[in-house]
UniProtKB/Swiss-Prot annotation:
It comes from Pseudomonas savastanoi pv. phaseolicola (strain 1448A / Race 6). One of its GO terms (biological process) is glycolate biosynthetic process. Its EC number is 3.1.3.18. Its cofactor is Mg(2+). This is Phosphoglycolate phosphatase. Pathway: Organic acid metabolism; glycolate biosynthesis; glycolate from 2-phosphoglycolate: step 1/1. One of its GO terms (molecular function) is phosphoglycolate phosphatase activity. Specifically catalyzes the dephosphorylation of 2-phosphoglycolate. Is involved in the dissimilation of the intracellular 2-phosphoglycolate formed during the DNA repair of 3'-phosphoglycolate ends, a major class of DNA lesions induced by oxidative stress. Keywords: Carbohydrate metabolism, Hydrolase, Magnesium, Metal-binding. Belongs to the HAD-like hydrolase superfamily. CbbY/CbbZ/Gph/YieH family. It catalyses: 2-phosphoglycolate + H2O = glycolate + phosphate.
Length: 272
């Protein structure tokens, strides 16, 4: 039985919200290049791929602080140094994403959901300025009606504000929505919003098994959500959906727009 069939009693959710890094794309190689560039400019030893893989998931400022601390615990990092490091990192990461790849099964799953008329949103802690260019490079942007970056709203995951916002915009209750992610922040945000969460075992969770966070389901391939597609050896052929003739059908939520609706979301503000 597929993931959707198990979670929604044989039906499909009306809305699926996705994380980006570690869920749809493996961006660690490019993030590691930017982190090491930052560390080298500051005269510090480079971190390397595997260290960066353990540090990602909570946004660029936290990643930079962890790199400067060379540890998950970054409480001792000087704020001025962190700001300097963040500026260098952002400049380095903005240059290119040549090593980022889309995970197997992602495009097939997104195409299938689009074909079935399921609304989709992207909610990531990645800084807003990097999200749309990366989605364009990976040819994933056309699948999402709503796109929210880590600095789009005053709160980021694990705060559920972005999930509440998207559900309100879509007119979909939590019982008919799903969040798909790979980290503790994703699971916590989904639980706080009352939304079922499917977690990917291949993503970034600071080196800890994502099953420890008790999501509704853990899978190792997005195609396991699709009815009839549990055989990973079977090729999945889906007709391409024509790209929207106008970008007006895609809503990229920006900080300016968010400030107009923040009062409407205030009653949903999560209290930790």
């Amino acid at each position: 039985m597929s993931g959707f069939e198990q979670l929604f009693a044989g039906k499909l959710p009306k809305l699926v919200m996705f994380d980006l890094d570690g869920t749809l794309v493996d961006s660690v190689p490019d993030l590691a290049v930017a982190v090491d560039t930052m560390l080298a400019e500051l005269g510090r030893p480079i971190a390397g791929l595997e260290s960066v893989r353990a540090w990602v998931g909570n946004g660029a400022p936290v990643l930079v602080r962890r790199a400067l601390a060379n540890h998950l615990d970054h409480s001792g990092v000087d704020d001025e140094l962190a700001e300097q490091g963040l500026e260098i990192f952002m400049r380095a990461y903005a240059q290119k994403h040549e090593f980022t790849v889309v995970y197997p099964g992602v495009r097939e799953t997104l195409k299938w959901l689009q074909k079935m008329g399921v609304e989709m949103a992207l909610i990531t802690n990645k800084p807003e300025r990097f999200v749309a260019p990366l989605l364009d490079e990976m040819k994933l942007g056309r699948f999402f009606r709503w796109i929210i970056g880590g600095d789009t709203m005053p709160q980021k995951k694990p705060d559920p504000a972005a999930l509440f916002f998207v559900m309100k915009m879509a007119g979909v209750p939590a019982s008919q929505a799903l969040f798909v992610g790979d980290s503790r922040s994703d699971v916590q945000a989904a639980k706080a919003a009352g939304v079922a969460c499917v977690a990917l075992s291949y993503g970034y969770n600071h080196g800890r098994p994502i099953a420890e966070e008790n999501p509704a389901m853990v899978i190792d391939d997005l195609r396991k959500l699709i009815p009839g597609c549990l055989d990973m050896d079977a090729e999945i052929l889906l007709p391409d959906i024509n790209s929207p003739s106008s970008r007006e059908s895609i809503v990229v939520v920006t900080r300016k727009l968010w400030m107009k609706v923040i009062k409407a979301l205030a009653r949903w503000r999560w209290r930790a």
